[in-house]
């Protein structure tokens, strides 16, 4: 092997250990695509105020800011894989429903029914941590990829 080839192989081996290997899901669906998908979902939610009556920041800014502060505290823990790539933003849906959900890319939606039901801030932090984990672990995207694979297999079988 010539000197240039040896140098290139050595440089490749040295630099290969310098960066973290991408997660397998990142090779199929990038984190920026999560953000785009989450933004598209948010646009759909905004377009359907009868089903998803979001509280406005103009009228309920204090409540939204309070929850966003809790979110920011959890995101700053340093334990998330995508904290620098996802925009963890809290939204409140004005409906008497005991639920919350996270969109790909970090947007989260909490129903007023759940917020009013929970008695302690720690309970809400627990739910919020759960939703943040869904986004950070990319559960929605993994499910979409899995479902598309199943659909592909079904279409190939038929």
Where are these predicted regions, by residue range?
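A Zn2+-metalloprotease active-site environment signal
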Residues: 3-10, 16-158
């Amino acid at each position: 092997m010539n000197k240039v080839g040896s140098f290139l192989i050595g440089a490749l081996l040295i630099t290969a250990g310098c960066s973290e290997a991408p997660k397998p899901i990142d090779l199929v669906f990038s984190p920026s695509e999560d953000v785009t998908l989450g933004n598209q979902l948010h646009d759909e939610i905004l377009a359907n105020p009868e089903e998803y009556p979001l509280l406005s920041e103009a009228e309920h800014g204090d409540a939204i800011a309070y929850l966003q502060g809790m979110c920011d505290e959890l995101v700053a823990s340093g334990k998330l894989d995508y904290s620098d790539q996802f925009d963890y933003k809290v939204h409140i849906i004005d409906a008497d429903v005991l639920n919350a959900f996270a969109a790909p890319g970090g947007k989260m939606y909490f129903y007023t029914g759940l917020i009013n039901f929970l008695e302690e801030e720690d309970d809400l932090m627990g739910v919020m941590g759960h939703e943040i984990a869904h986004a950070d672990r990319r559960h929605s995207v993994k499910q979409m990829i899995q479902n598309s694979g199943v659909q592909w297999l079904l279409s190939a079988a038929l």
